[in-house]
């Protein structure tokens, strides 16, 4: 199994604990180091993490994996057409690709975080393709078609990821502020333009409004995403 945009192993490590042979690839060296440290601490010899770009997997051979997974990861890689081609290339015939992608204009948490963050961030460079276009059905089908996968081999469905957090919405926001790339970048840009307080107020209101928990000091926020399953 290959996990692209693996972070420190949120998906990859549980799969390895179930017995899969897993390679995790992420662009962030600190997350790769953290993933390898977690694997060592757990005594897992069937998983490793390495630095890499989901749009350029030249170090990986064709037809290397039975399963390629990317949950909210490869969607943020540059050159989405290259991402589609690369994940198809490294998947064995008869294998599967599974992606979880946030959906543009969705009213739930992460799509709204990305919308708000973009409003406080500098304009993207010319030619930039928004990562959230990976949440558009027709766009996903077109990208995999260009990689040689017919539309009837691509399955798309709406699904829900639930943030269950043993803390307040403000404390969950603090984690996003410190560790989630789009939010980190938005806070940095807002601080530079003197709008950090406005950004924080807007995001804090969002987290509080979306919290479905009735327990004091707890947070439960559902977020809708597009689950993409590709038969290769």
Residue ranges: model-predicted function:
Residues 2-57, 82:
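Class I SAM-dependent methyltransferase SAM/SAH-binding core
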Residues 21, 95-96:
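Short glycine-centered segments of the SAM/dcSAM-binding site in methyltransferase folds
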Residues 66-80, 103:
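A short SAM/SAH-binding and catalytic strip from SAM-dependent methyltransferases
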Residues 77-78, 91-93:
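Helix-to-beta-strand junctions that scaffold the AdoMet/dcAdoMet cofactor pocket
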Residues 81, 96-169, 183:
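Conserved catalytic/acceptor-binding region of the Class I
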Residues 147-149, 223-232:
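Core SAM-dependent methyltransferase catalytic element
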């Amino acid at each position: 199994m290959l996990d692209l945009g693996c972070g420190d192993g949120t998906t990859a490590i549980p799969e390895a604990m179930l017995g899969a042979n897993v390679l995790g690839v992420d662009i962030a060296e600190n997350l790769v180091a953290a993933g390898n440290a977690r694997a060592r601490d757990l005594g897992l010899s069937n998983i490793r993490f390495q630095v890499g770009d989901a749009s350029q997997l030249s170090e990986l051979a064709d037809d290397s994996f039975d399963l390629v997974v990317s949950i909210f990861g490869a969607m943020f890689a540059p050159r989405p057409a290259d991402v589609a081609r690369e994940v198809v290339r490294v998947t064995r015939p008869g294998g599967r690709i599974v992606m979880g992608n946030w959906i543009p204009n969705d009213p739930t948490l992460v799509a709204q975080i990305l919308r708000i963050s973009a409003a406080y961030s500098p304009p993207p460079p010319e030619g930039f393709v928004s990562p959230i276009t990976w949440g558009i059905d027709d766009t996903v089908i077109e990208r995999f078609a260009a990689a040689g996968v017919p539309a009837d081999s691509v399955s798309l469905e709406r699904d829900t990821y639930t943030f269950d957090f043993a803390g307040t919405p403000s404390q969950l926001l603090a984690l996003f502020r410190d560790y989630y790339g789009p939010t980190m970048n938005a806070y940095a840009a807002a601080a530079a333009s003197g709008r950090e307080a406005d950004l924080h107020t807007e995001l804090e209101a969002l987290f509080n409004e979306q919290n479905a928990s009735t327990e004091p000091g707890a947070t439960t926020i559902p977020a809708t995403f597009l689950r993409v399953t590709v038969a290769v």
